[in-house]
C-alpha cells in the first residue's frame, strides 16, 4: 500500500492528484487552486493567508516574482517597532513572538507550489534546470510531484553551496555540505578546536553530531589518532564521508549512525549543536 502523501486539486471539474514532497514533513495542503500570471498579487496573498495553496501553472520566473510580492506584503504587515502596546514584556515573550511571526511567514510563503515531472524537470515556461539540486535532496524520482517554490529555492541554494564549498583555513581546504547539513560558514568554533590545547595522550576523540565532518577533520589533522564522529542523519554521514575522503582524513575517522554518544569513553569530546 502506498502511504506517500498526495496533493489533491481539481481542474475543469476533473480531480487530480500528485505526490507531495516536503523536506519539513509538512502535510499536503487541503485547499488548492490553480494560479498563473493573470492572478493579482493581492488575490494570491489573500488566498494564502486564508489557507489556500496556489499551484502555479504560468511562467516560472513570474512565480518567483509572485513569491517576492507575497514577501513584500508580509513585510508591510509586520508590527513596527515602538508601537504602544505591542512590545513584549520579557525576553521569553519576545522570542516566542518572533518564532510565531517567522512560522506564520513561512506558512504563507509555502503556499506557492510548483509542479515537477518524475525526472525533476519543471513543466513551466522559463523554468531552470534543477534536476541535480532536486536529485541531491529528494533522490531519484519515480512519478510527478508537487513541492513549494520556497523549498525549491532552498534546494537550489544548497546545491550551489555544495558545488562551491566553504573555505576552512584550519584545514587548508574546503568543506562541501549537502542539503540539510549545517554549513560551517562561521569559523569561531572551528578555530577553537584547531587552537585549543589537546588533553595529554588524546589518542581518541568523539565528535558528537559530526554533520559535515569539519571538526572530525580538524582533530584528525591535529594528530588525534582516532576520531569517532556520530550523527543520526544519513545525509550528514554521507556528507562527512565525502569531505573526509576529499581531505584524506577518512582513515582516521570512524563515522557511526548513533544517537549522540558511541560506546566507550574518550578523553576528548567535541560538539557543535545547531542553534
Regions found by a protein language model. Give the residues of each.
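SAM-dependent Rossmann-like transferase core, predominantly class I methyltransferases
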Residues: 130-204, 208-210, 214-218
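Conserved SAM/SAH cofactor-binding pocket of Class I
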Residues: 186-273
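Generic low-polarity alpha-helical segments
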Residues: 1-2, 8-12, 262, 269, ...
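N-terminal auxiliary segments of SAM/dcSAM-dependent transferases
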Residues: 2-25, 29-166
